[in-house]
Amino acid sequence: MKKTLLCLTLAGLLSACGGSDNDSGSNQNPPPSNQTIENYGTFLNSSVDNVSYETSSGISGTLTEENKTFKYQSGDKVQFSISGVQIGGLVTAQDNISPADLFTDETAQKNLLSFIDALDSDPDTDGVQISDEILEKLKNIPSITFDQPFENFSTQISETNLLNDQVLVSPDEIVIKQQQVFYKDIAGTWQSHENNSVAVIHILTNGNYILGQASPKDAESEAGIELGSLQWNPLNNSFEPTITHDTNGTAGLSHASDDKPYTLSSDGTYLILHEPGANSTYKLTRVKQSSGLVGTWKFSETQLFAFFDNNYYFFLDGIGGDDCGWAGIEYGKYSITSNTLAVTEVLYDTNECAGFHDTSDSAKVNATYSISGTSLTLHPQGEDTFTLQRSN
């Protein structure tokens, strides 16, 4: 992936993403080398309440529903525990701790996920809520051996009477379950920014995604669309996407540097993409939503409009038109006057006649619109009305 994944710096348009320069992960004025930098990380890509941590620099605390991240200084090691029961050993502190960071053995990694899953006292809510009853029981358990066959691990947990009659989810099933939970958590529309490029990615609850890239053409990449499936691995946060359509060259998620898989995690605010081959980290933010036009609207799961709050829009078209056009993107400016939407400038258009602009005659849409609940109805001049549904 070239370092063009992602959103609005064109013409100084960072506010279109509802973000700021700080979201790019770069710092034009780094602090002095002797200044202590405090970082924040997440534990297992989930909001797990009552996980305690202590770092080698002396920082300690407990993760809660309100405070989902742990603090650490660069170069720190960190130890995690729940009611005194250690979870793995002392590991390098970083922006996300995966099972593979805590245990080298895959069996132990899966056992850990099954264990954390079983501790959840309210599976119907987001995150993992550990009841006071279980926390008290854990205080009487000196240690738990994760590095053992699942059958033995399950027996050990059963003998502690920690979970009463609850059965642990099997190793294969827990991987699928954690994938589903993660996809649900990150589903929606995200953006970031890098140099003079703009891109938007919409992720579905099954892990499929559509990514649009608007950037100047170079020898390796160009504006275009990418569709695929993340294929995320909950054991180490890595993913090697299956690409089904790609017109943006090396931009997007299709070309990981040095063929080293990406990793993907979330802290509840940012979607954090790391590219090991380039030693680069990108933090994406959700597209701002509102009760008005600003936000994401869908015609289908792979045809979506994102309207930003400074009068820019982005159209993701993963299908194309029946009579003209093909899958692609459209990015431009719009104005609103008395419930009339007018496209004023088109900066990129790779899907020909679909969307708000027709490249064959440079015609731009001028349409009245109305919003009712979660529906947006547009009536372009001289055309039939069409309705979009609000997306997250």
Predicted region positions:
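Contiguous, well-ordered beta-strand patches that form the walls/edges
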Residues: 194-198, 213-278, 300-303, 317-386
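Acidic/polar residues in short coil/turn loops that connect beta-strands
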Residues: 57, 204-206, 267, 308-310, ...
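Structural signal for glycine-centered tight turns and loop->strand junctions in beta-sheet-rich domains
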Residues: 76, 205-209, 236-237, 268, ...
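Sec-dependent signal peptide recognition
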Residues: 2-8
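Short, solvent-exposed mixed-charge patches
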Residues: 390-392
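A glycine-anchored, Pro-Gly-centered beta-turn/N-cap motif
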Residues: 188-189, 295-296, 332
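Feature for extracytoplasmic/surface-facing segments of secreted or surface-associated proteins
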Residues: 20-191, 233-235, 263, 267, ...
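C-terminal motif of bacterial Sec signal peptides marking the signal peptidase cleavage site
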Residues: 15-16
